[in-house]
Amino acid sequence: MKRTYVGPSGNREAKLGCCGEQPGVQEVRASPPRPFVGPAGQGMDECLQMTRIPRLEMYLTNVIKDLDAPLSHYINLTSQGKYTISKEGYQYIQGLGEELKSLDLNVIVAFGNIALIALTNRVGITKWRGSVLESTIVPGLKVVPTFHPATFIPPKFNFLNKPLICEDLLRAKYESEFKEIRRTRRNIRIKRGFRESVDTLNYCYEIGLRGQTIDIDIEVINGEVDCIAFAWSPTD
């Protein structure tokens, strides 16, 4: 039998939800116990205020619902990006799926790597944050991963995560307005020849002089530039 348990809270009719990792001491001691009322919850509230998202209109939950054991007991994530899930961890993930299937959410925000793993079976919050993914435990449910609010408060103090969380919350707010997953069609051209590459660089230079923004993505492997990508519009 569990010594501690913190169930979900919020609006069960909501279109937008947030999923954290595990309750903390303040959540367990709250009366009644509920998620996101500790320091990380206060950080989340600050982000919600900045993005004008009413907390009362959201559904809030966690992957792990107790504080009987450390998070790594349920889902253990290594520094190499590998993870293992215990039997109890699988039970919680399965329960989360049933919980979310009973709702009518359009999108849920995954706070942190553990929520990302549970909801999408993916790992790498820095890589996936801000993306719109489909949940693997609730088909059709959109998931927007972002950093956990605990990352920008003591003791971690990663202050730059706060505006990124706000940006991702705004993305989730927009996605909550409709059910379907909308994909942008992109024209991607790869393995360009020398002449085509020079022409592309000249084109980027010319439109850059006219004030158009050029996005550049540089991939570095073992300290050497492996490839460079240029984008001059959301589709090209």
Which residues make up each language-model segment?
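A polyanion-binding, active-site-adjacent surface
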Residues: 1-182
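Conserved RNase H-like, two-metal-ion catalytic cores of nucleic-acid enzymes
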Residues: 31-35, 41-45, 51, 183-236
